[in-house]
A protein has these predicted regions:
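Helix-to-loop junctions at the C-terminal end of transmembrane segments
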Residues: 12, 137-152, 230
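Extracytoplasmic gate region of multi-pass secondary transporters
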Residues: 4-9, 13, 66-131
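Flexible cytoplasmic inter-helical loops of multi-pass small-molecule transporters
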Residues: 18, 46-65
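Helix-loop-helix hairpin linking two adjacent transmembrane segments in secondary transporters
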Residues: 1-48
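C-terminal transmembrane helical hairpin of 12-TM major facilitator-type secondary transporters
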Residues: 150-193
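Glycine-rich segments within core transmembrane alpha-helices of 12-TM secondary carriers
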Residues: 1-13, 209-223
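Multi-pass alpha-helical transporter architecture, strongest
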Residues: 39-46, 242-266
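Intracellular juxtamembrane helix-capping segments at the cytosolic ends
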Residues: 187-205
């Protein structure tokens, strides 16, 4: 995801502007991506992962309760919904926000440059913003691997606060560069939410882990709603970022209150 915006700009579109691109120019590239995904999927389906003792029911054993009876899991699924949703909202639409402002006469610079040319291909600043957003998430995940001594509730709460503040700052200043920082703060969210959602679920853990994946649908719905909001606003993206703020605030709520275990399986 870090290199994908540059890949699309330079390899798929060849540095052309959006107005110059037509569907025939991207068919071969995306067919190639489909082949890669198919190969990776085949490899993953043939991998045998070890079972972790105590995380699922014994063979033939029937679970007495529904996983939905655990409130911290149910709210965790919603947390994943908002997390994946706001993550994709920023990653997918920050470039459209920047392009809108550029078309209105705004100029964005990167170390004094209004574009970045590599190998004769002009990589626009909006694509660079998306790359830096995903890159910040990558760096954050590398750093967060050394934060095991900090409780996941604390990591999640701090990250949600700063992500919300950065997004509000982008709205107030009408500046997409502030959204780039959100990627760094998003880096710890998946692991923190997942850890909190399956806490003390014992033999329900395996089923709960699969249940949590329902929440990833937020990655398709929230960006869609944001795009519809932008269309309703006449193509203006500025105020649509409140969708991201709402998502960050729910994640903060989950970190502080929603993740508390009211009923445990162990």
């Amino acid at each position: 995801t870090t290199l994908a915006p540059f890949f699309v700009t330079g390899i798929v579109f060849g540095g052309l502007s959006m107005e110059e691109v037509n569907i025939s120019q991207i068919q071969v590239s995306f067919l190639g991506l489909m082949v890669v995904f198919a190969v990776v999927t085949l490899i993953l389906t043939r991998m045998k992962l070890p079972d972790i003792k105590g995380t699922k029911a014994e063979s033939g054993e029937k679970l007495e309760k529904s996983v939905w009876s655990f409130s911290h899991l149910m709210m965790g699924v919603l947390g994943i919904f908002f997390y994946v949703g706001v993550e994709v909202c920023v990653g997918a639409n920050i470039n459209l926000y920047a392009i809108e402002l550029q078309n209105a006469g705004r100029q964005f610079l990167f170390f004094g440059m209004d574009s970045l040319t590599i190998g004769g291909v002009n990589f626009a600043i909006p694509a660079l913003m998306a790359t830096l957003y995903w890159g910040g998430m990558l760096i954050g995940r590398l750093i967060s691997s050394s934060l095991n001594s900090i409780p996941p509730q604390t990591q999640l709460a701090v990250a949600a606060i700063f992500a919300a503040l950065s997004t509000v700052g982008a709205i107030v200043a009408d500046n997409p560069w502030l959204l780039v920082a959100v990627g760094f703060f998003h880096s710890v969210m998946w692991g923190s939410i997942f850890t909190l959602a399956i806490s003390r679920l014992g033999k329900y853990t395996s089923v709960a882990s699969g249940t949590i994946m329902i929440g990833v649908i937020g990655g398709s719905l929230l960006p869609l709603f944001q795009g519809m909001f932008a269309d309703a606003m006449g193509g203006m993206w500025r105020w649509t970022w409140f969708i991201v703020v709402i998502g960050e605030l729910y994640i903060l709520y989950y970190a502080l209150l929603g993740s508390k275990v009211k009923q445990a399986a162990d």
